[in-house]
């Protein structure tokens, strides 16, 4: 059985790591490179970096910090932010990233997923999906440009349909960002994860809501996700990754120690 992955997520804005709650009111956490080093040393399996305003600003990730991160860590990392073409992706991979993740650009141009998968292989193409539960309609809706509070908006896609669409087009992995849970630390949305898992045949990463070690165990045991991504609990040192892995192992969950 493949080991379950623990993935710290670093939201980057203006060259620094920031963290919001439900995608709003971001505070500065610190510099990118020391945080990346700390997580690698603690035992993270992978890191994800989101340049959260690149898409809404119409630019690509600042590649200088990608190269700096690649120099100091020896675990795989994925970079997202404003990647609109194979050239954009190639540059980020050349600077040392192992995977690229696309979100808003894939919604604007779904063919981009196929182009990137054909050129670089599905294993390094991740699609991020920002999913919002609308209590009034009872539906899970995909949102776009979520890094910018002024520009964020609902798309015409329901989450389950978009999950199926991106797989058809060549997504090698899906990160499901559950917006209602983001930064709230009261657990992953297990119901939503199960709904997506039913139609997701590629690795599925849960994102949004981790607040305690039990929340990670729940996502693995109750929704069979392949990885769990979290930010604030790691940034604020609420949870140590090494201790989390020991806990998961005690719960009978396969992890890399």
UniProtKB/Swiss-Prot annotation:
Subunit structure: Heterodimer of HisH and HisF.
Its job: IGPS catalyzes the conversion of PRFAR and glutamine to IGP, AICAR and glutamate. The HisF subunit catalyzes the cyclization activity that produces IGP and AICAR from PRFAR using the ammonia provided by the HisH subunit.
Location within or outside the cell: Cytoplasm
Gene3D superfamilies: Aldolase class I
Gene giving rise to this polypeptide: hisF
Protein name (Swiss-Prot/TrEMBL): Imidazole glycerol phosphate synthase subunit HisF
Amino-acid biosynthesis as UniProt keyword: yes
Catalytic activity, reaction form: 5-[(5-phospho-1-deoxy-D-ribulos-1-ylimino)methylamino]-1-(5-phospho-beta-D-ribosyl)imidazole-4-carboxamide + L-glutamine = D-erythro-1-(imidazol-4-yl)glycerol 3-phosphate + 5-amino-1-(5-phospho-beta-D-ribosyl)imidazole-4-carboxamide + L-glutamate + H(+)
